[in-house]
């Protein structure tokens, strides 16, 4: 390379250094000073990664004094270029030596980089274009936020997430029956809200025992990095901010922390966008005396726009508490309990009409009259005639049914506020098989019971029943706490033999208390050396997680996990299918929670429930009440709480000392009431809720589309190529997985999310679901999003020169391929990308300025091209400059026309969608008070803002590829 002192060069590898000046040429070395940063670089003269900067007539250059020059002519003196042209401020003709050019010039624009000789590799141009297409594809998907999470594609979960996640500030109660995946539904909604920037700050409130589990679930399933806050963390965070909650965007904490006034005040002041409350059935409320827990959540719900309440049992603490939870979501709507009860009674007619529409038979006169009355503001006669007609296309009839059903759901009930799926409406659950094992009552327990009776003392019926149900605890009271009751209890003997005969099976054992759980572990370990681990309230969260992980290990793990009652709240072990109930809880909801640890959607085997019990005791009588009265072992019993509250006194009397006649009467009354309640619960709003909550055919369609996306081989190829070009090491691990590691030759110094020790990933959802240590890669995964951002946020691939070997065209024929981006600057929370996402516009010009892009598609054109090295490419660009400048102007004209069309389409789409949604909600608000004014106001404001942003849309040249025809 010919170097001379004072010449201006730019570094091909460190363009951020700005414009360099040659300060020394000695022997085979050249030294360049980069004044903008004050750094020197020494290069070999023959292999220097440098490009000479020479501007051309028509360019504008800036002097080191700040004024600009419009270049008209170039001359050369002493190997230095002198620019002649018009001074930007005075209008006079002036000259400027290249030595006096502004040092801070950086060639970020593709044209500048092209003419400065900064030519990228051919494959980098291709990957940049592919990255822009992927970003556009993701932004325009109406399933954004549902593809990325590592969860099974279960229709009702995807439907709820799709419906709720795209709302502004959703306020809903997720109340699916136990085992249907409320945590996953909440995670999907959170993920969607964050990905679309409808929310940025999220607070999750959970019981102490579930904080770490939520932390792990959010990270492992949804790639969301929450922080757990306790008192110690708040004190520690005070060093960074007066309000510790401002130090993180995504926070998990317990209700216990927020019971403290100081912490609650700080949480109230922390500008959350979304509040999530798990186990919301613990929020007890009466009008006269709301619980402290309820008051905490109520205060937060008044200042946080979005609220998700999770509860498996809306009526667990009574119907009044269920009303109170709805009141948290919308106090204007649910203002009076009596009015709420009266409204619920009216749901029966709605449910009958909805069920008729959901079926396939002709509508009865009663159903038609009900529909006409319920939808009185709408003329439904044409739809009714279509449904009732003979010989009509069944698809048309089904469409009419669906339309009326949607109108019904929109206008009546709590469908927008409450989502509740029952097992009756969701398929995919295993059978529950109940096995009972009777044993004689040990003499030691009988003696302890007699002594207890002789001592007398005042005790409540419930306390007496608890003693009768757990004779080992009573025995310990009279002996001592270390009494080895497990040495003679026949249930323990049975348990040991059962585990020995099922050595290859994982077995979950649940007992009511921690002491019992610890004693059982000691018995299994000391008597037979059986590997078991315990899980109880006396353990730290980390200890519990370790116990759960030890139990989950297939090789070398514990055969049995012994839990106290807390083990049946929030923890899931569906990889096991054997459940041993060492005793029975008095509350049927707790029994269902115990069984629900294994009986969950996704369980692949039938659940074997084993109950060893002592004959002729309270244990046997409670077993009979659960099994014969409620059928609670083999089926879920959603009305269990109601039945327990109605028969509590009668049941307690039978448990403490009732005779056979009293037991028989209790069982008969319970069975009769159970049937009544079951029939009643099949009527009214539950059916209406289920129709709205599981999504039907629409939910199935969403899942089918997501499954098709999972099989998109083009995406897999694009992502693998992206990692190849960035320089990520990829090691095939087998089992549909690869290990990604950063390499020394990566294009970028860091790749956020890619750790030094690597990460194992898969594109196969089933593989990811079966292996907690393997990440599921979709276009929503942070590793993919980061890769796209690294490429599109840098100048990688913005310029390229290629050769087209085609003898049908004259040698030297030139083509100019331009990639423009149509974009508008707007906060992501505005949702502008739904209508005008960053859109790549491809223009392919011949030398006469004709756009050939419609005739020559990108892929087929790209396959015919060959790369050239940077130096040859730079020379070809320099030689072609007279042709290129007018082509750039022509390309911008074509692109501007395309942008104008995109903006017009975006404006039309936005106006149509938002006006339609606004009109729909305004008309619904007249008949369904569940429509909140905040949602309407949000839509009105959004239309105004989006119009402003669209008017300011811009066109930006993103990448250039110059192609020359060669016959060589």
Curated annotation (Swiss-Prot):
Top enzyme category: hydrolase
Superkingdom to which the source organism belongs: Bacteria
HAMAP family: Helicase_RapA (MF_01821)
Limits of the Helicase C-terminal domain: 491-655
Segments forming domain Helicase ATP-binding: 163-332
Subunit structure: Interacts with the RNAP. Has a higher affinity for the core RNAP than for the holoenzyme. Its ATPase activity is stimulated by binding to RNAP.
Residues binding ATP: 176-183
UniProt protein name: RNA polymerase-associated protein RapA
UniProt xrefs under CDD domains: DEXDc_RapA, SF2_C_SNF
GO molecular function, one term: ATP binding
Motif (DEAH box): 278-281
Keywords for the protein's UniProt record, in alphabetical order: Activator, ATP-binding, DNA-binding, Helicase, Hydrolase, Nucleotide-binding, Transcription, Transcription regulation
Family classification: Belongs to the SNF2/RAD54 helicase family. RapA subfamily.
Assigned EC number: 3.6.4.-
Organism of provenance: Shewanella oneidensis (strain ATCC 700550 / JCM 31522 / CIP 106686 / LMG 19005 / NCIMB 14063 / MR-1)
Keyword match Nucleotidyltransferase: no
């Amino acid at each position: 390379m010919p170097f001379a002192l004072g010449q201006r060069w730019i570094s091909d590898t460190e363009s951020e250094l700005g414009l360099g000046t040659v300060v020394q040429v000695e022997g085979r070395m050249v030294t360049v000073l980069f004044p903008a940063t004050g750094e020197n670089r020494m290069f070999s003269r023959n292999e220097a990664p440098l490009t000479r900067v020479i501007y051309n007539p028509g360019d504008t250059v800036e002097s080191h004094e700040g004024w600009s020059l419009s270049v008209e002519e170039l001359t050369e003196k002493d190997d230095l270029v002198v620019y002649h042209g018009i001074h930007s401020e005075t209008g006079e003709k002036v000259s400027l030596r290249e030595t006096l050019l502004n040092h801070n010039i950086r060639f970020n624009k593709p044209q500048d980089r092209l003419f400065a000789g900064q030519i990228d590799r051919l494959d980098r141009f291709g990957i940049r274009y592919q990255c822009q297409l992927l970003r556009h594809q993701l932004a325009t998907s109406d399933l954004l936020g549902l593809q990325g999470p590592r969860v099974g594609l279960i229709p009702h979960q995807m439907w709820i997430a799709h419906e709720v996640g795209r709302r502004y500030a959703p306020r809903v109660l997720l109340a699916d029956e136990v085992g249907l995946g409320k945590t996953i539904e909440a995670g999907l909604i959170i993920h969607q809200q964050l990905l679309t920037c409808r929310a940025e700050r999220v607070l999750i409130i959970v019981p102490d025992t579930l904080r770490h589990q939520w932390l792990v679930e959010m990270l492992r399933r949804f790639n969301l990095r929450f922080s757990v806050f306790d008192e110690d963390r708040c004190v520690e965070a005070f060093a960074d901010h007066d309000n510790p909650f401002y130090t993180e965007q995504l926070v998990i904490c317990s209700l216990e922390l927020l019971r403290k006034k100081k912490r609650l005040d700080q949480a109230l002041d922390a500008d959350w966008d979304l509040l999530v409350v798990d186990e919301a059935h613990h929020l007890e409320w009466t009008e006269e005396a709301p619980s402290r827990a309820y008051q905490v959540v109520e205060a937060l719900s008044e200042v946080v726009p979005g609220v998700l309440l999770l509860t498996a049992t809306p009526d667990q603490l009574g119907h009044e508490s269920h009303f109170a939870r709805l009141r948290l979501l919308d106090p204007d709507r649910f203002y009076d309990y009596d009015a709420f009860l009266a409204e619920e009674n009216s749901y029966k007619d709605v449910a009958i009409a909805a069920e008729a529409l959901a079926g396939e038979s002709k509508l009865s006169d009663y159903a038609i009259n009900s529909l006409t009355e319920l939808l009185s503001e709408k003329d439904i006669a044409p739809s009714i005639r279509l449904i009732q007609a003979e010989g009509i296309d069944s698809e048309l009839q089904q469409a009419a049914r669906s339309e009326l059903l949607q109108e019904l759901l929109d206008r009546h009930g709590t469908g927008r506020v409450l989502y509740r799926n029952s097992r009756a409406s969701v398929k995919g659950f295993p059978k529950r098989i109940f096995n009972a094992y009777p044993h004689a009552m040990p003499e030691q327990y009988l003696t302890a019971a007699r002594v207890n009776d002789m001592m007398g003392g005042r005790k409540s019926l419930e306390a007496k029943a608890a003693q009768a149900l757990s004779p080992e605890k009573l025995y310990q009271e009279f002996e001592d706490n270390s009494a080895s009751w497990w040495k003679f209890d026949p249930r323990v003997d049975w348990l040991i033999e059962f585990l020995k005969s099922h050595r290859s099976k994982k077995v979950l054992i649940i007992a009511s208390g921690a002491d019992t759980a610890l004693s059982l572990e000691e018995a299994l370990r000391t008597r037979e050396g059986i590997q078991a681990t315990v899980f109880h309230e006396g353990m730290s969260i980390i200890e519990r997680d370790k116990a759960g992980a030890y139990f989950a290990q297939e090789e070398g793990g514990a055969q049995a996990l012994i839990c106290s009652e807390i083990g049946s709240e929030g923890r899931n072990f569906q990889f096991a299918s054997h459940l041993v109930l060492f005793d029975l809880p008095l509350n049927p909801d707790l029994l269902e929670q115990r069984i629900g640890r294994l009986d969950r959607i996704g369980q692949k085997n039938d659940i074997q429930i084993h109950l060893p019990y002592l004959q002729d005791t309270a244990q046997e009588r409670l077993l009979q009440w659960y099994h014969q009265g409620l059928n609670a072992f083999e089926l879920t019993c959603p009305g269990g709480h109601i039945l327990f509250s109605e028969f509590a006194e009668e049941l307690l009397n039978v448990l403490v000392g009732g005779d056979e006649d009293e037991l028989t009467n209790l069982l008969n009354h319970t069975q009769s009431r159970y049937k009544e309640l079951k029939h009643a619960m099949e009527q009214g709003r539950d059916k209406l809720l289920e129709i709205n909550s599981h999504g039907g055919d629409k939910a199935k369609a969403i899942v089918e589309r997501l499954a098709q996306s999972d099989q998109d081989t083009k995406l897999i190829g694009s992502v693998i190529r992206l990692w190849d070009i960035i320089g990520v090491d990829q090691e095939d691990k087998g089992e549909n997985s690869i290990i990604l590691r950063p390499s020394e030759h990566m294009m970028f110094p860091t790749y956020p999310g890619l750790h030094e020790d690597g990460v194992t990933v898969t594109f196969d959802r089933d593989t990811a679901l079966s292996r907690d240590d393997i990440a599921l890669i979709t276009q929503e995964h942070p590793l993919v999003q980061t890769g796209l951002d690294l490429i599109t946020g840098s100048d990688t691939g913005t310029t390229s020169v290629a050769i087209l070997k085609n003898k049908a065209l004259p040698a030297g024929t030139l083509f100019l391929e331009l990639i423009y981006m149509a974009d508008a600057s707007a906060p992501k929370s505005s949702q502008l990308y739904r209508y005008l996402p960053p859109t790549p516009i491809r223009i392919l010009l011949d030398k006469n300025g004709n756009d050939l892009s419609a005739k020559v598609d990108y892929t087929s054109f790209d396959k015919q091209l060959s790369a050239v090295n940077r130096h040859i490419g730079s020379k070809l660009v320099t030689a072609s400059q007279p042709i290129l400048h007018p082509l750039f102007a022509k390309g911008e004209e074509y692109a501007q026309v395309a942008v104008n069309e995109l903006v017009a389409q975006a404006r039309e789409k936005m106006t149509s969608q938002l006006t339609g949604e606004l009109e729909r909600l305004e008309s619904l608000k007249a008949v369904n008070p569940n429509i909140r004014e905040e949602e309407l106001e949000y839509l009105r404001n959004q239309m105004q803002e989006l119009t402003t942003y669209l008017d300011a849309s811009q066109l930006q040249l993103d990448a250039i590829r110059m192609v020359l025809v060669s016959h060589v």
